[in-house]
Every structure is written in structure tokens, then in C-alpha cells.
């Protein structure tokens, strides 16, 4: 499920797809566009004041010009200031709304992606997409929009004014426009290519930081500081190089456009120096035209830069749409149930992980009666956790079927199915929230504090919770870093008790605990297992001796099954594992 950018998609197609996101806020865009045009027109009108000032005010000593000119100038400045404020506010409002909407779309889409997607994609890359890329879409596009409208209106306004006063001199502009258009077209492709490289470099840079932070203890214990530093230095330098390529291209581009514009300016000066032409023009007209051509330099420069800015936004937008095009979890089931009995059947189930040719499970068959306990044992990588992943529909079976209360697992809605299952794993994830909110995660509105406390008591968690200063309101830190492994496990068991699901899955729930903690945890687990269909994965075979049936999994197949005593007497794989563990 790898995703990539399709460089053949045109900017127009990308923008056309972005438009439905922008469309609800088009009122802000319309106001911003109008005020940007007003802002540009006010600049042009201020230049136009030079003609009456020079021809009438100084040339003919008309004092009335000096009386009304300051008032007009002040009015134009007020108009310019107010339109500038309105345009900036509206554009910021629209871009803020757009980036918020894109982030929400992306967040919700990623949250509903299948587990396989997260195995293939790094956390840092996805975080970069939601934060950096989403911001690039809004900031680059809004910045480009401001430039295109305001500077474009300035160019149009100045050109109209120049043609109005002397169309003969202004014809030179028509000659240079095709040249400028060709240059912009050629450089735009270069900007797009560099923009993609910058985006990918940023993602890799964030990934490097994430690995160092998550593996900080390993970095320290193995002395990997030099390795991580070199990796980060290389990636940050590559990011700098791509950024400099963008600057270099832009720096060459700008003078080239300005040189073409200066040629036009030189042509105007030359034409204006011809006696037959100069007789037709006043000092004010020459000044306005010449000043307008100089004033054109700034908007032309900005318009040449807008290509790089716009390309960054479109590249980021294309990447985000590529993710949004990926299919979320398949949820075609229609059946919803409040509470199942918990009768599970694996019927000739075969499963391949994506992009592998060897089956992880092959012809798996077993039956768990409602309220019974089945244990899965076997060496690491034998396929035990895969069975759990199929039961929770993190993956779908390749061949065969899984039945729950006689109904195919695929016929249940994902929400309804997962409401029937409580899972306690070896690596418990706790959110950076209170103990109470972690126990009642995603159900805080449905459970009272009394029921949360009761679940904690049954999970033997009250002992350490009551000793904490804030009790159930204690913040546990990121991934419960302020708690020990045993404490985190008891929180997870309390969470499972509170959910009170008919099916319980214990995946190596005690493998990382010391003996004392394990004894406490198993008191909780024995309470948790009552009247529930339980599926237990365990390396410590002493913990599953009382299971109703033990399945020995080897290379994706069930090679032995039975109760503890019978399997020991059978002198097979289970017996070997047991003897090896207790030798």
C-alpha cells in the first residue's frame, strides 16, 4: 500500500480537486479579491496623480491642484490601508479554514486506514503530511493567490494607465509579454521538481528526529550518538541543498525577467527621445509612463516568484490527495449486534500478509465454545498473533472463513464486531491523560466514576492508584511513562473489565512482568475470564495449564491440540517446549 506522487497530474487537475474544499469559504475569497484589486488600483491612481501635479501644478502654476491633491492622496492612502487590512484578514481566514479542513480530512482518513498501512508508513512521515504538507497547501496557495490578484491587478492597472496616456510607447509591453510567458513556463517545471524533493527531504528529516527521540535509550546505551548525528547532519544538509536550488533557480529567474523589462524600458526611452514623439508628450505624461514602467518591476518580480510558491502548494496537495485516495478498512458488513454469545469457529483459514508468497496461516481449524478458554502456544513467528489479527479483522482472511455465533465475521459491521472484543497485549498503550480516562477510554460519557473505580479494584490497581497524589486524576504521561509495566497492565485489564465484552484476547499479557507482578495480574485475569470466551497467547506455559484446550502452532499450522496433561503425555512439540522452559 505504498503511495507515491504522480508527477504527470497537472496543476489544474489538482486545483480542481482542491476547489470543493475551498468553495464553502468562497465569500472570503471574493471579498479578498475585491479588496486586493482596490489595493492595486489605489497604487496606480497615486502614480496617475503625477500628471496633473507636473502639468497643471508646476507647469501652469495652478494652485488649486495643491489644494485638492493632498485630500485625494489621503483618501487613496486610507482606501489602500483599509483594503490591505480586509484582504489580509480574509485570506488568512480562508487559508486557516482550508488547512483545518484538510487536516481533519487527512486525520480521519488515516485513522480509518487498515493496520497494514501503518506497518508500511513511518509515524514521522504521516505526521509531516498532517502538519507540514497541509500547512504548505494553505500558506503557499493563499500566498500565491494574493500575489496573482494584487500584483496582477497592479500590472493590468499600470498597463491601462500607460496605454491611456500613450498607446504608442506602451506597445513595447506587448512585445515582451510572450518572452516573459515562455520563461515562466520553463522555470515552473523546475520549481515543481525541486518542490517535490524539498517535501520528501522534510519527511525524512522528521523521521530521523522521531527515531532518535523514540529510541533515545538505545542511542545512549549503544553509543549511537555519532551515527544519529551523522544521519541528521546528512539529511539536514540535503534539505538545505534543495532549498538553495530553489533559491538559485528563483535568483536566476528574477534578474532574467527584470532584464527583459529593462529592455522594454530602454526602448520606451529611445522612442520618447524621437523629436516627433516628444512633441506629442507632456512632462507629466512622460513621467507617469516612465514611473509606471519602473513600478511594473515589483509586480513582475513577484509574479515570477509566485510560480515557485504555487508549485510548493500543489506538490503538497498532490501528496495529500494520494493518501486520501487510498482505501480505508473494508467495512461491507451490515449486521450489528448488542452482545454476542462468543462462539468462534475458524474454518479452514489460510492467510498471506501483503506482498508475501508464504502463508502465515495454513488451513487453520478450531472451535471455541461460548465461555471457554483456548490457549495458543508456539515459537515466535509461528502465527499466533496473526490469528488474533484476523479475529479482530485487522486483516481479512485469504481463504476459508471465521464465524462468530454462526455468522461470517465479514457480515458484521467493524464497529459492532470490535465492541464484542477486549484485548490486553504485552505492549499496553496508554494515552497522555488521567488514569480514569485511560480506563474508560472512548467511553468516558457512559461510565460513572464509581464503575471506573470498581473496575480498578477488580484489576488489583487500587493499591498503586490510591498512593498517587491525584489518584484517578493522575496524568500518566506519554504512553504511561510514569507507570511501571505491571501498573500499565493492570490499567489495561481494568479497561477490559469496564468494557465487559463477551470475548477476551490476552496476547502475551504477562510475558514482560516479574513473578510478583505476574501473580497480581493473573488474579485480575482470572476475574476477567469469567463467563467470557477467552483466547490466550502465552510463552509462559505455566499460565495456560487450566485452559479448556491448548493449540500448538508451528509455521502457520496447528500441529497439536488438547489439554495440558494430554499434551505432556503425548511427548510432542508442546512437551518439548514445556521441558525446555522448565529445565
UniProtKB/Swiss-Prot annotation:
UniProt: ATP binding residues: 378-385
Pfam families on file? ABC_membrane (PF00664), ABC_tran (PF00005)
Q: Which PROSITE patterns match?
A: ABC_TM1F, ABC_TRANSPORTER_2, MSBA
What residue stretches are annotated with the ABC transmembrane type-1 domain? 30-312
Instruction: Give the subcellular location.
Output: Cell inner membrane
Q: Supply the SMART domains for this chain.
A: AAA (SM00382)
Known catalysed reaction(s)?
ATP + H2O + lipid A-core oligosaccharideSide 1 = ADP + phosphate + lipid A-core oligosaccharideSide 2
Q: How does it sit in the membrane?
A: Multi-pass membrane protein
Q: Which UniProt keywords apply?
A: ATP-binding, Cell inner membrane, Cell membrane, Lipid transport, Membrane, Nucleotide-binding, Translocase, Transmembrane, Transmembrane helix, Transport
GO molecular function term, any single one: ATP binding
Identify the CDD domains for this entry. Answer: ABC_6TM_MsbA_like
Transmembrane portions of the chain: 18-38, 65-85, 105-127, 143-163, 167-187, 252-272, 277-297
What are the ABC transporter domain coordinates in residue numbering? Answer: 344-580
Query: What does this protein's UniProt record list under function?
Result: Involved in lipopolysaccharide (LPS) biosynthesis. Translocates lipid A-core from the inner to the outer leaflet of the inner membrane. Transmembrane domains (TMD) form a pore in the inner membrane and the ATP-binding domain (NBD) is responsible for energy generation.
The written remark on domains in the entry is: In MsbA the ATP-binding domain (NBD) and the transmembrane domain (TMD) are fused.
Name the family the entry cites: Belongs to the ABC transporter superfamily. Lipid exporter (TC 3.A.1.106) family.
Protein name (record): ATP-dependent lipid A-core flippase
Source organism of this protein record? Blochmanniella floridana
Amino acid at each position: 500500500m505504498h503511495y507515491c506522487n504522480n508527477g504527470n497530474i497537472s496543476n489544474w487537475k489538482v486545483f480542481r480537486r482542491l476547489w470543493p474544499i475551498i468553495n464553502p469559504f468562497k465569500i472570503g475569497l471574493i471579498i479578498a479579491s475585491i479588496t486586493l484589486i482596490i489595493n492595486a488600483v489605489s497604487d496606480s491612481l497615486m502614480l496617475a496623480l503625477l500628471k496633473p501635479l507636473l502639468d497643471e501644478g508646476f507647469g501652469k502654476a495652478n494652485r488649486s491642484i495643491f489644494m485638492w491633491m493632498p485630500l485625494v492622496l489621503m483618501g487613496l492612502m486610507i482606501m489602500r490601508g483599509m483594503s490591505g487590512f480586509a484582504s489580509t484578514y480574509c485570506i488568512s481566514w480562508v487559508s486557516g479554514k482550508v488547512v483545518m479542513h484538510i487536516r481533519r480530512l487527512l486525520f480521519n482518513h488515516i485513522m480509518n486506514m487498515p493496520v497494514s498501512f501503518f506497518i508500511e508508513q513511518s509515524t514521522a512521515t504521516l505526521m509531516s503530511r498532517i502538519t507540514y504538507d497541509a500547512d504548505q497547501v494553505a500558506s503557499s496557495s493563499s500566498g500565491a493567490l494574493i500575489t496573482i490578484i494584487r500584483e496582477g491587478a497592479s500590472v493590468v492597472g499600470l498597463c491601462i494607465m500607460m496605454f491611456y496616456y500613450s498607446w504608442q510607447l506602451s506597445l513595447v509591453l506587448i512585445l515582451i509579454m510572450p518572452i516573459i510567458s515562455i520563461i515562466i513556463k520553463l522555470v515552473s517545471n523546475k520549481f515543481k521538481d525541486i518542490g517535490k524533493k524539498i517535501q520528501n527531504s522534510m519527511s525524512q528529516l522528521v523521521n530521523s528526529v522521531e527515531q532518535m527521540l523514540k529510541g533515545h535509550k538505545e542511542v545512549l546505551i549503544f553509543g549511537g550518538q555519532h551515527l544519529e548525528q551523522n544521519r541528521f547532519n546528512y539529511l539536514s544538509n540535503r534539505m538545505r541543498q534543495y532549498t538553495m536550488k530553489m533559491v538559485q533557480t528563483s535568483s536566476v529567474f528574477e534578474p532574467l525577467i527584470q532584464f527583459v523589462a529593462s529592455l522594454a524600458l530602454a526602448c520606451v526611452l529611445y522612442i520618447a527621445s524621437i523629436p516627433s514623439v516628444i512633441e506629442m508628450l507632456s512632462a507629466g505624461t512622460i513621467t507617469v509612463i516612465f514611473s509606471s514602467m519602473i513600478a511594473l518591476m515589483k509586480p513582475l518580480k513577484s509574479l515570477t516568484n509566485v510560480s515557485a510558491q504555487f508549485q510548493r502548494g500543489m506538490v503538497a496537495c498532490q501528496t495529500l490527495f494520494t493518501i486520501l485516495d487510498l482505501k480505508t478498512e473494508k467495512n461491507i458488513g451490515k449486521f450489528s449486534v448488542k452482545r454476542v454469545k462468543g462462539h468462534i469457529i475458524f474454518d479452514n483459514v489460510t492467510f498471506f500478509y501483503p506482498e508475501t508468497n508464504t502463508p502465515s496461516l495454513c488451513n487453520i481449524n478450531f472451535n471455541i465454545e461460548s465461555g471457554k478458554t483456548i490457549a495458543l502456544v508456539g515459537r515466535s513467528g509461528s502465527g499466533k498473533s496473526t490469528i488474533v489479527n484476523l479475529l479482530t479483522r485487522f486483516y481479512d482472511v485469504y481463504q476459508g472463513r471465521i464465524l462468530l455465533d454462526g455468522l461470517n465475521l465479514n457480515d458484521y459491521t467493524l464497529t459492532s464486531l470490535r465492541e464484542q472484543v477486549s484485548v490486553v497485549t504485552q505492549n499496553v498503550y496508554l494515552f497522555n491523560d488521567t488514569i480514569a480516562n485511560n480506563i474508560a477510554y472512548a467511553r468516558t460519557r457512559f461510565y460513572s466514576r464509581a464503575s471506573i473505580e470498581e473496575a480498578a479494584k477488580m484489576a488489583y490497581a487500587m493499591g498503586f492508584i490510591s498512593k498517587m497524589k491525584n489518584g484517578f486524576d493522575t496524568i500518566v504521561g506519554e504512553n504511561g511513562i510514569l507507570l511501571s509495566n505491571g501498573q500499565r497492565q493492570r490499567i489495561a485489564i481494568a479497561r477490559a473489565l469496564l468494557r465487559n465484552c463477551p470475548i477476551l484476547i490476552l496476547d502475551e499479557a504477562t510475558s514482560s512482568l516479574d513473578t510478583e507482578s505476574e501473580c497480581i495480574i493473573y488474579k485480575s485475569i482470572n476475574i476477567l475470564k469469567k463467563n467470557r470466551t477467552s483466547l490466550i497467547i502465552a510463552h509462559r506455559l505455566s499460565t495456560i495449564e487450566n485452559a479448556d484446550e491448548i493449540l500448538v502452532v508451528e509455521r502457520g499450522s496447528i500441529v497439536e491440540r488438547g489439554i495440558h496433561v494430554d499434551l505432556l503425555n503425548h511427548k510432542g512439540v508442546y512437551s518439548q517446549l514445556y521441558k525446555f522452559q522448565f529445565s
